[in-house]
């Protein structure tokens, strides 16, 4: 049996970020993943500005290597399509200036991002990175946990569980239950040759009337590829008996804004489905000697479905909490509360604003009315750009009086 200070379960973005941050402070760890890398990961492959921000904070050299090796596409904004086919182009940063502003966002296949992060960990951790190694169960030990894996037992003083949305091993700590209203179901596939992609690689979100509060997406990728998908809240999928792949095909065949662009496009492989555990502040994500990070902690943005940035942030914060635990020699419940508090401080506000936006999308007629009024309004793109950089502005957009004022002031 090998012994370590921290056992990290999962080598996705959450787990690898935790490992790299622990390594900076020389805290011993073992990181295990059931997969071998590179491997496919079902995802939209769109990364928000949070991703370069937190990787740079970990190490500017790692961010440079990521850009060099993975050659992600820089994406500069979002094209929103509202019910009624109203189109709004919203740059992430208004009047973007590459000298002054950080990279606004990326698109890159998750297969590449995840393999890159694993390679970075492998370079510093060597055999402490155990791939093709499945965690089967965890039990409480005398001074921490005993983790039973397909490659033998590991004894660890702490656990960072970053095992994603679909892990199924038995653990002696509570894991959040996936409630249908707090879960989205999504499918994605790849196409080659989709026409009319935005020259500045804007990602496209189609909030169509029949799929609200979900959306259909077209995300441009390097090498002439595009990631195409659809995601809808699970309770809505179940209630309306929606077949996501069929609805996605129907949009590609018949939506007047979409179908002409797919006429000569080729689908590469079958659509693949997965669930997204949407952010839920009620969950307990830490306790004596353990922390949950990323999807295991249900940290996906309820409006946009963004989870990679939040997984990286939570992995980073979990590692810093673990460093505090070893420095103070405190692993008790009360001390671990700080982890949840810091996650709420960093991600809580945007999660709750996104939850409220998502609730608003339940009313298609209202959304259509707002879109009609907003069409051609010169204040809207700037206002929506500020949503990405200023949380207080995003909050203002939930205030009906503020929205009415902007809509009337054409
Ligand atoms: C269809 C779809 C589209 C999405 N689109 C986007 C997007 O465009 N942008 C975005 O930011 N987010 C998107 N997301 C969300 C994003 O994919 C997740 O939030 C992100 O992967 C979370 O990272 P993580 O490290 O927490 O978990 P994961 O990336 O899931 O990593 C968990 C790891 O744990 C391992 N593991 C699980 N069980 C065990 C076990 N028993 N033993 C050992 N290892 C185990 C797995 O093999 C995996 O490698 C999308 C999700 C879906 C489903």
Protein language model annotation of sequence segments:
Residues 120-261:
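Predominantly flavin-linked oxidoreductase catalytic cores and closely associated redox partners
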Residues 1-14:
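Beta1/beta-strand and adjacent pyrophosphate-binding region of the FAD-binding site
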Residues 12-13, 37-38, 112:
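Residue-level detector of alpha-helix initiation sites
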Residues 137, 153, 236-321, 327:
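FAD/FMN-dependent oxidoreductases across multiple families
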Residues 41-84:
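N-terminal FAD cofactor-binding segment of flavoenzymes
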Residues 7, 23-43:
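Glycine-rich FAD pyrophosphate-binding loop
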Residues 323-410:
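C-terminal helical "tail/cap" subdomain of flavin- and related membrane-associated enzymes
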Residues 96-119, 238-243:
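Short beta-strand to alpha-helix junction loop
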């Amino acid at each position: 049996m090998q012994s370590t200070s921290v056992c990290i379960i999962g080598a996705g973005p959450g787990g690898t970020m935790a490992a790299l941050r622990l390594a900076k402070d020389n805290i011993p760890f073992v990181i295990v993943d059931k997969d071998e890398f590179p491997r496919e990961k079902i995802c939209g492959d769109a990364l928000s500005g949070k991703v370069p921000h937190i990787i740079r904070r970990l190490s500017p050299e790692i961010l440079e290597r990521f850009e060099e090796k993975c050659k992600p596409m820089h994406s500069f904004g979002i094209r929103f399509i509202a019910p009624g086919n109203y189109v709004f182009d919203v740059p992430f940063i208004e009047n973007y200036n590459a000298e002054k502003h950080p990279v606004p966002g990326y698109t890159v296949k998750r297969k590449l991002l995840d393999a890159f992060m694993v390679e970075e960990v492998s370079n510093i951790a060597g055999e402490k990175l155990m791939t093709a190694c499945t965690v089967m169960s965890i039990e409480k030990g005398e001074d921490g946990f005993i983790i039973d894996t397909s490659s033998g037992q590991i004894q660890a003083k702490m656990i960072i569980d970053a095992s994603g949305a679909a892990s199924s091993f038995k653990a002696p700590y509570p894991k959040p239950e996936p409630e249908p209203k707090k879960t989205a179901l999504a499918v994605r596939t790849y196409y080659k040759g989709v026409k009319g992609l935005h020259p500045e690689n804007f990602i496209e979100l189609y909030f169509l009337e029949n799929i609200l509060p979900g959306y259909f997406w077209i995300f441009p990728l390097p090498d002439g590829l595009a990631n195409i998908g659809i995601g809808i809240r699970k309770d809505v999928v179940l209630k309306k008996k929606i077949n996501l792949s069929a609805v996605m095909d129907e949009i590609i065949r018949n939506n007047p804004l979409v179908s002409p662009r797919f006429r000569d496009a080729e689908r590469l492989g079958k659509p693949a489905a997965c669930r997204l555990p949407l952010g839920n502040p009620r969950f307990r994500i830490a306790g004596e000697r353990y922390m949950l990070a990323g999807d295991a902690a249900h940290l996906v943005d309820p409006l946009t479905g963004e989870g990679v940035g939040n997984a990286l942030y939570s992995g980073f914060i979990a590692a810093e909490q673990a460093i505090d635990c070893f420095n103070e020699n405190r692993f008790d419940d009360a001390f671990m509360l700080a982890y949840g508090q810091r996650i709420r401080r960093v991600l809580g506000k945007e999660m709750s604003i996104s939850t409220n936006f998502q609730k608003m999308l339940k009313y298609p007629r209202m959304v259509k009315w707002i879109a009609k009024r907003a069409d051609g309004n010169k204040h809207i793109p700037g206002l929506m750009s500020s949503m990405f950089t200023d949380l207080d502005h995003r909050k203002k957009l939930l205030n009906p009086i503020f929205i009415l004022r902007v809509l009337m002031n054409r």
